[in-house]
Protein backbone atom coordinates (compact mmCIF):
# COMPACT_ATOMS: atom_id res chain seq x y z
CA UNK A 1 0.00 0.00 0.00
CA UNK A 2 1.32 3.41 -0.96
CA UNK A 3 2.22 5.90 1.75
CA UNK A 4 1.36 9.57 1.83
CA UNK A 5 4.03 12.29 1.38
CA UNK A 6 4.50 15.25 3.75
CA UNK A 7 1.61 17.72 3.65
CA UNK A 8 -0.97 15.00 3.07
CA UNK A 9 -3.90 14.54 5.45
CA UNK A 10 -3.53 11.31 7.43
CA UNK A 11 -6.21 11.66 10.11
CA UNK A 12 -5.59 9.06 12.82
CA UNK A 13 -3.49 6.75 10.66
CA UNK A 14 0.10 8.01 10.97
CA UNK A 15 1.36 4.66 9.75
CA UNK A 16 0.20 5.63 6.27
CA UNK A 17 2.62 8.56 6.17
CA UNK A 18 5.88 7.99 4.28
CA UNK A 19 7.63 9.67 7.21
CA UNK A 20 5.46 7.72 9.69
CA UNK A 21 4.72 11.00 11.46
CA UNK A 22 1.33 12.67 11.67
CA UNK A 23 1.25 16.02 13.45
CA UNK A 24 -1.46 16.73 14.23
CA UNK A 25 -3.40 15.42 11.27
CA UNK A 26 -0.97 16.02 8.40
CA UNK A 27 2.03 13.95 7.40
CA UNK A 28 5.29 15.70 8.25
CA UNK A 29 8.79 15.00 6.96
UniProtKB/Swiss-Prot annotation:
Q: Which PROSITE patterns does UniProt cross-reference here?
A: DELTA_CONOTOXIN
Q: In which tissues is it expressed?
A: Expressed by the venom duct.
In this UniProt entry, the residues modified to Glycine amide are: 29
Membrane-spanning intervals of the chain: none
Compartments where located: Secreted
User: Which residues does the record list as 4-hydroxyproline (modified residue)?
Assistant: 5-6, 14
Per UniProt, which keywords does this protein have? Amidation, Disulfide bond, Hydroxylation, Ion channel impairing toxin, Knottin, Neurotoxin, Presynaptic neurotoxin, Secreted, Toxin, Voltage-gated sodium channel impairing toxin
Output the InterPro entries linked to this UniProt entry: Conotoxin_d-typ_CS (IPR012322)
- Gene Ontology CC annotations of this record: extracellular region; host cell presynaptic membrane
- The chain's disulfide connectivity reads 3-18, 10-22, 17-27
GO MF: sodium channel inhibitor activity; toxin activity
The record comments on the domains as follows:
The presence of a 'disulfide through disulfide knot' structurally defines this protein as a knottin. The cysteine framework is VI/VII (C-C-CC-C-C).
Return the similarity comment.
Belongs to the conotoxin O1 superfamily.
Function of the protein = Delta-conotoxins bind to site 6 of voltage-gated sodium channels (Nav) and inhibit the inactivation process.
Q: What is this protein called?
A: Delta-conotoxin-like EVIB
